């Protein structure tokens, strides 16, 4: 067992193989340490998020080392049967690759239960494994398909999996099931969770069904008839989303946190209008939005440095300040121009934006496509009951935000895979400035510089958990800086992660700006005794 640094609130446990990883994950899950916030199991690692205000990394490691997971842990196993029509387009090719008949491939797939090792790639996509590895390692397609139908049963490497929704993919398709791997109308949307036992049933020549127990329908948590519309969207801008603090305790289903990118600006907007800190608000990308006021309300705009305008019913335009409480009357209009610095504004409405929650949050996840859809023209913004205190007249705006062409310094914590890179490349990582490209979004910032980073370990990295702020290095050597909507697991080594105190700053870096990375001095020394 090896412990690797990830960030001030997270660490990576590296184990020898999948079997030991699953044993330890089940044990830690059942032990339920009060200061462990979340765990992301993967092929040979467990990413552990903890509360650094309650426990140090060293104390947590000491506790984990003292645990003695049992090899025969069977607690809370669910047994699920999934019926499959084995008519996938790649089935003959897989049989040829393995020097088997099609019948033999099917027989091997159904002859013993598979176990859900971890959830990754997409919500509800379980990586299923068997100790006997019945197919060895099945190669992925040379050219991934642009669209794979939901319910497709597939093989890749030592795993089998079922696509939960229509999506691109490079796995070999051997069959199809009609069961829903991901269904938000169920109490537990993900059909499969880590450590579940799955048995495939061949129903190629008869109708399919799926055995799922304890399925319940959810009910909406917002009664539309009780809501008060206060704003109407006249211009929706490039991307305007409802966001709050994000989702918690859903990583086991393959779902990320999402949530407001610049938490500081989001919290201040709510504070100014007297809301709870976690009240839902609007996140506006690159300005260009306009709203019509339908009922008396108080709002605040924070985040990027933008011109903000109030146009009254007589068409009189008044420029107003950000980080200030704004009392608006019916027929007024509120306009936020594209920013001069930064990239995201936050618009809080007294009472909070009211909308149905999905998996405990009002946030929209752009990768998983979960939560309230991006706002469009004529959408109505309704308020809830999140106001708990008096309105504050104003709050202090943050330090100067980055502009295109400028350089901003960002602290990083090295790890967990720093040793996979040549020492010269690590020096180059800190020496050169990295430009944020226009191929950047809530999933991640794509960076570029003249000299890509080179690896000294060339082997393929098994998928492992990644944190927000992780700097993953693909084969071209140009980093991808993962943000709030990033996939929970990744297959490229992570050189470093943005220190938690600089994540808000990163959320406001526009395309065309440059990042100068600095090594954060408080690196976790997990090897010290």
Predicted regions span which residues?
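Conserved "landmark" site that anchors the functional core of diverse proteins
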Residues: 1-529
């Amino acid at each position: 067992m090896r412990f690797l640094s990830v960030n001030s609130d997270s660490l990576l446990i590296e184990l020898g193989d999948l079997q030991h990883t699953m044993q330890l994950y089940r044990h830690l899950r059942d032990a339920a340490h009060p200061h462990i916030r979340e765990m992301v199991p993967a092929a040979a690692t467990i990413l552990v998020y903890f509360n650094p205000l309650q426990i140090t990394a060293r104390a947590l490691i000491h506790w984990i080392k003292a645990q003695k997971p049992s090899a025969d842990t069977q607690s809370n196993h669910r047994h699920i049967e999934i019926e499959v029509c084995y008519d996938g387009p790649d089935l003959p090719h897989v049989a040829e690759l393995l020097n088997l008949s099609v019948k033999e491939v099917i027989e091997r797939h159904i002859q013993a239960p598979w176990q859900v090792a971890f959830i990754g790639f997409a919500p509800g996509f379980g990586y299923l494994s068997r100790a006997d590895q019945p197919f060895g390692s099945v190669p992925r397609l040379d050219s991934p398909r642009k669209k794979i139908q939901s319910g497709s049963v597939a093989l890749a490497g030592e795993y089998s999996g079922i696509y939960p929704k229509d999506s691109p993919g490079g796995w070999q398709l051997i069959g199809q099931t009609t069961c829903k791997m991901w269904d938000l109308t169920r109490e537990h949307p993900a059909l499969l969770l880590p450590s579940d036992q799955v048995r495939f049933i061949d129903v190629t020549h008869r109708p399919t069904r799926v055995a799922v127990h304890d399925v319940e329908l959810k009910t909406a948590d917002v009664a539309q008839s009780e809501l008060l519309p206060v704003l109407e969207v006249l211009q929706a801008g490039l991307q305007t989303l409802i966001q709050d603090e994000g989702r918690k305790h859903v990583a086991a289903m393959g779902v990320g946190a999402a949530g407001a990118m610049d938490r500081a600006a989001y919290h201040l907007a709510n504070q100014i209008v007297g809301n709870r800190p976690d009240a839902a608000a609007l996140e506006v990308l690159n300005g260009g939005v306009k709203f019509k006021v339908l009922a008396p309300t108080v709002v605040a705009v924070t985040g990027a440095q933008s011109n903000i305008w109030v146009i009254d019913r007589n068409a009189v335009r008044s420029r107003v300040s950000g980080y200030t409480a704004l009392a608006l009357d019916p027929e007024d209009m509120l306009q936020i121009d594209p920013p001069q610095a930064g990239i995201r504004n936050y618009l809080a409405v007294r009472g909070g934006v009211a909308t149905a929650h999905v998996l405990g949050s009002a946030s929209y996840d752009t990768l998983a496509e979960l939560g309230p859809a991006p706002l469009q023209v004529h959408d109505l913004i309704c308020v809830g009951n999140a106001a708990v205190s008096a309105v504050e007249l104003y709050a202090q705006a943050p330090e100067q935000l980055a502009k295109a062409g400028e350089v901003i310094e960002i602290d990083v914590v090295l790890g967990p895979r720093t040793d996979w890179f040549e020492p010269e490349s690590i020096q180059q990582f800190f020496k050169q400035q990295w430009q944020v490209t226009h191929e950047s979004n809530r999933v991640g910032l794509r960076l570029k510089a003249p000299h890509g980073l080179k690896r000294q370990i060339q082997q393929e990295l098994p998928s492992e958990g990644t944190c927000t702020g992780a700097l993953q290095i693909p084969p071209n050597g140009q980093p991808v800086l993962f943000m709030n909507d990033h996939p929970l697991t990744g297959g490229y080594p992570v050189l470093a992660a943005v220190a938690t105190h600089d994540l808000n700053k990163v959320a406001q870096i526009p395309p065309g700006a440059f990042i100068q990375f600095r090594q954060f001095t408080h690196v976790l020394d997990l090897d010290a005794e």
